[in-house]
Amino acid sequence: MSIQSGEILETVKMVADQNFDVRTITIGIDLHDCISSDINVLNQNIYNKITTVGKDLVTTAKYLSAKYGVPIVNQRISVTPIAQIAAATHADSYVSVAQTLDKAAKAIGVSFIGGFSALVQKGMSPSDEVLIRSIPEAMKTTDIVCSSINIGSTRAGINMDAVKLAGETVKRTAEITPEGFGCAKIVVFCNAVEDNPFMAGAFHGSGEADAVINVGVSGPGVVKAALENSDATTLTEVAEVVKKTAFKITRVGELIGREASKMLNIPFGILDLSLAPTPAVGDSVARILEEMGLSVCGTHGTTAALALLNDAVKKGGMMASSAVGGLSGAFIPVSEDEGMIAAAEAGVLTLDKLEAMTAVCSVGLDMIAVPGDTPAHTISGIIADEAAIGMINSKTTAVRIIPVTGKTVGDSVEFGGLLGYAPVMPVKEGSCEVFVNRGGRIPAPVQSMKN
């Protein structure tokens, strides 16, 4: 395939002017060989394995970034869900395991480590429950550990006992961490994927290799610039522009991933195509939708525009890589997207509209600040609604919601860095407490019967 000089200049502009970057190189590490009935031995085994497998990740990323001139923003680690790994200890708390993950991740210099997780879509083992109840204290006493809970799937339905506990866990975490910041490191999933490189929801699935490299790219600014500079008039033409741009973005990510795999001698897993925004101007998914013809993100037509964007990104990315996986779509995290923040502050982008948008994109209600007095059962209800969308549509959905203690609608909260800031958004006045407290399981839908 011949490369034109114009295409080379396009790639240079992507990095220099349009905020293109490789968002993360994530090493997934299997911890099954660390299992011990003694929690102290387990912690030592975990520390040793992470610091051995991941020791060269940061230096490799810096080398590749310099070699190719492409920023590689984060280096991360994901591990096997700790509820599985710590079960043999029969401990009544896994906070020490979270602290070990934190210590190991800091020792090798990575940005985040994910996998303080439990998969409870069909039921909770004693270990799962211990882990979930350990999350608030774990988030309070660690800095870069991320946690996730998978409470439902298309095949299993929704575990409402776990949904209730997840809502209480988020609420408790908000109460004991400054401005609820610990909740920014907790994701509650339906249909969680095993090869996600993005935080806070990354964990290393049990069906994965001993270690694997997963890469996430980010290029909302590139897509917006491509639309600004194109002569596309119809939405068919808009989709074509997005598709071609996604192809170019993906090729860069594929190159970085394969090179990292070779240098680290770890198999290349997947490339996640997700358009991941940042709070920086010019790096917003919302502004892409507005470029398509919306006056403000969140107005009528937003869900349709997002569906077009998400599908075109996937089509372009799939052509560029044979290893597409993870979440692969367009993220809509309110606090991490300058355009979403503006739309929410204007009162146009609401929680209800965001929920509708999650039906057509990845991944879910993300980085949304709500009043600090929001009850736990309301958080559980929001989680259940989002899980239902994922369950029925056979897609990954998730909730990362932050009840901000002492704040109410009209206030805003600053998280800093890539997490940005967010206006506090209202939740519904009515109560779902009786519904949530019923417990049990919402049965798997008829779509689950595929054999």
Curated annotation (Swiss-Prot):
Q: What Pfam families does this protein's entry cite?
A: DUF711
The positions making up the signal sequence are: none
Q: Entry's InterPro entries?
A: UPF0210
* Domain of life where this protein originates: Bacteria
Which SUPFAM superfamilies does this chain map to?
A: PFL-like glycyl radical enzymes
- Cystine links in this protein are none
**Subunit annotation:** Homodimer.
Protein family according to the UniProt entry: Belongs to the UPF0210 family.
Family annotation (NCBIfam families): PRK05313.1
Identification of the protein by name: UPF0210 protein NMB1652
Q: Which organism is it from?
A: Neisseria meningitidis serogroup B (strain ATCC BAA-335 / MC58)
